[in-house]
Amino acid sequence: MARKSLIQREKKRQKLEQKYHSIRRSSKKEISKVLSLSDKWEIYGKLQSPPRNSAPTRLHRRCFSTGRPRANYRDFGLSGHILREMVHACLLPGATRSSW
């Protein structure tokens, strides 16, 4: 189980990312349209003005039940060992164990 402070920090980053998403997207579109180098540098400066934690690269997908940041499956939103336990307990419909 991840510490609650780490989970809260991740939620705060998600809120910041949503807040500044439109600003980042619009300035990136401007960069592709502008041809002069000096104008591009000004727009790059605008991109650096939002807080660092608002960047989408700083977000991690976390397990829905444990908050574990590694080995997550996007389809289920669970980490690998929790997914395995739930499949063994037949709690996930349609998921089957592999056998060969």
From Swiss-Prot:
GO molecular function: rRNA binding; structural constituent of ribosome
Keyword terms of this UniProt record: Chloroplast, Plastid, Ribonucleoprotein, Ribosomal protein, RNA-binding, rRNA-binding
InterPro entries the UniProt entry points to: Ribosomal_uS14, Ribosomal_uS14_bac/plastid, Ribosomal_uS14_CS
GO cellular component: chloroplast; small ribosomal subunit
Sequence segments annotated as region (Disordered): 1-23
Main location: plastid
PANTHER family: 30S RIBOSOMAL PROTEIN S14 (PTHR19836), SMALL RIBOSOMAL SUBUNIT PROTEIN US14M (PTHR19836:SF19)
Family named by the database record: Belongs to the universal ribosomal protein uS14 family.
Designated name of the protein: Small ribosomal subunit protein uS14c
Organism field: Panax ginseng
Gene it is expressed from: rps14
